[in-house]
């Protein structure tokens, strides 16, 4: 439903329009619309298969109305008929949001997104609304150590560690179309791991346990690399029907029919939905398969660098 017209809200803009186009003053208002605008927390619409359902598709959340209708209709048809679009649609996928998203989060991020529509955007800028929604157990220690956080899939993750006395606007003020103040800190961290050793909080990565009598056959079909032996680890990919990359997985084989899968932290609901639907489709062929999302249950640290073994030996 539309709201009552409130010209006072647009008086400044209306007068500016008349100044720019004087004929508008004589023509007057012929019609009016005052209604809500659809927004999503990141400003992108929701386009693609609905999570957890089959043959259910979403195309909503368009903040600029019908302007994307032609393109969305084309790529939606490709997904429905061919199983995927000819371009990467991940940034619009409805599953980029998970069960962690609260009503308050949606409201505050939508307001923030609306406020930034016509503001200059810098590369990799981070926006503060709803900071701290999802954090690892090490969050307070990281913050005390100067961590400058970015937000992915609701998680606060350290982008880099800045000066201990940095104020809350340090990262925002360091963003630029050139090298910002963050540059030297990121370089130092990369050099430390490349030449020495470093500790990485990987808690926000997506984590699944796949097990059951059909797990080995299923993952052998689902991924394109040879599965590791028990107690070993390898890198592999799940592919689309046309052979392009769908998801990158690190697989740890904990038992004959039990596997621990790690994938990108940004796509937990996306990967979980794909895994579950694929397992359901193949259960009759391969046998019983369990899929457990343990992302929120397990905290993870990774230690990396050429001096890793000497640290672990102490």
Question: Language-model features: where?
Answer:
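Glycine/proline-enriched, intrinsically flexible loops and inter-domain linkers
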Residues: 87-88, 93-314
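C-terminal catalytic lobe of FAD-dependent flavoproteins
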Residues: 2-134
């Amino acid at each position: 439903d539309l709201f009552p017209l409130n010209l006072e809200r647009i008086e400044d803009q209306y007068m500016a329009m008349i100044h720019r186009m004087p004929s508008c003053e004589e023509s007057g208002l012929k019609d009016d619309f005052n209604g809500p605008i659809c927004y999503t927390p990141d400003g992108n619409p929701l386009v693609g298969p609905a999570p957890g359902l089959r043959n259910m598709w979403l195309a909503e959340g368009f903040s600029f109305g019908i302007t994307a209708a032609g393109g969305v209709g084309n790529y939606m048809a490709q997904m429905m008929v061919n199983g995927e679009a000819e371009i990467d649609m991940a940034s619009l996928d409805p599953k980029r949001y998970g069960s962690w998203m609260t009503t308050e989060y949606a409201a505050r991020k939508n307001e923030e997104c609306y406020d930034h529509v016509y503001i200059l955007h810098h590369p990799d800028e981070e926006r503060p609304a709803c900071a701290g929604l999802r954090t690892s157990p090490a969050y307070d220690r990281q913050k005390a150590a100067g961590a400058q956080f970015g937000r992915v899939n609701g998680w606060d993750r350290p982008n880099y560690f800045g000066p201990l006395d940095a104020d809350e606007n340090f990262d925002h003020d360091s963003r630029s179309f050139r090298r910002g103040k963050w540059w030297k800190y990121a370089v130092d961290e990369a050099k430390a791991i490349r030449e020495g050793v470093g500790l990485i909080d990987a808690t926000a990565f997506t984590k699944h346990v796949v097990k059951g009598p059909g797990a080995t056959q299923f993952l052998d079909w689902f991924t394109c690399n040879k599965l590791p032996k028990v107690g070993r680890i390898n890198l592999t990919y799940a592919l689309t029907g046309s052979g392009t990359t769908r998801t990158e997985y690190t697989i740890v084989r904990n038992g004959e029919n039990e596997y621990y899968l790690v994938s990108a932290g940004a796509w937990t609901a996306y990967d979980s939905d794909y895994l579950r639907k694929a397992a359901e489709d193949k259960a009759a062929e391969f046998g019983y398969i369990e899929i457990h999302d343990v992302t929120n249950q397990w905290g993870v640290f990774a230690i990396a660098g050429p001096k890793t073994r000497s640290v672990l030996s102490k």
